[in-house]
C-alpha cells in the first residue's frame, strides 16, 4: 500500500503543495542501510530546480546524538552542519535540492543499523524528460 501511495496522484499533489516545488513524479525509490563504519561525505546534487529529496527513517531506540541521520549543510563541509535529525524512529527529513542543499552522514562508530527509504520527487515531461536530464532526441551519426 505504501509503495502504491507514493506513486499516486494524491501523494504527488500533497507533496507539491507542501514543498511548493513543481514536482509531478517519483524518480527514485530505494532502501538504504548504513552499519558500523558507514558514512557519507557531504555532497550537493544540485540536479535541478524541481527536485525534492525525502529520507524516511525506521530505527527503534536510536540514541540522541548518535550519527546516522542525514545532516544538512549549506556547503560540502560537515563542520558547517546546520541540522541533523536525532530521532530516527519513524521520522523523516525532506529538503529541496539546490546549490546550497549539502548533506551527508557522520561516521557510524557503533554496531548499529540505520534503515531508511530514500525518495526523489521531480518534475518530468514526456517531451523533455526529467528536469535534470533532458531527453536527447537527436542521435549522433556513427
Residue positions per predicted region:
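Signature of the catalytic double-stranded beta-helix
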Residues: 1-28
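Catalytic core of Fe(II)/2-oxoglutarate
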Residues: 32, 37-38, 45-50, 58-142
Amino acid at each position: 500500500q505504501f509503495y502504491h501511495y507514493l506513486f499516486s496522484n494524491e501523494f504527488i499533489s500533497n507533496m507539491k503543495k507542501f514543498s511548493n516545488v513543481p514536482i509531478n513524479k517519483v524518480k527514485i525509490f530505494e532502501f538504504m542501510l548504513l552499519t558500523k563504519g558507514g558514512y557519507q561525505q557531504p555532497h550537493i546534487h544540485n540536479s535541478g530546480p524541481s527536485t525534492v529529496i525525502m529520507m524516511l527513517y525506521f530505527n527503534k531506540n536510536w540514541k540522541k546524538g548518535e550519527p546516522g541521520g542525514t545532516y544538512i549543510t549549506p556547503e560540502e563541509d560537515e563542520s558547517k552542519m546546520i541540522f541533523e535529525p536525532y530521532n530516527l524512529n519513524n521520522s523523516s527529513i525532506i529538503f529541496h535540492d539546490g546549490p546550497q542543499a549539502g548533506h551527508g552522514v557522520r561516521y557510524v562508530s557503533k554496531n548499529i543499523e540505520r534503515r531508511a527509504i530514500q525518495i526523489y520527487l521531480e518534475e518530468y515531461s514526456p517531451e523533455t524528460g526529467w528536469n535534470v536530464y533532458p531527453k536527447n532526441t537527436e542521435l549522433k551519426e556513427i
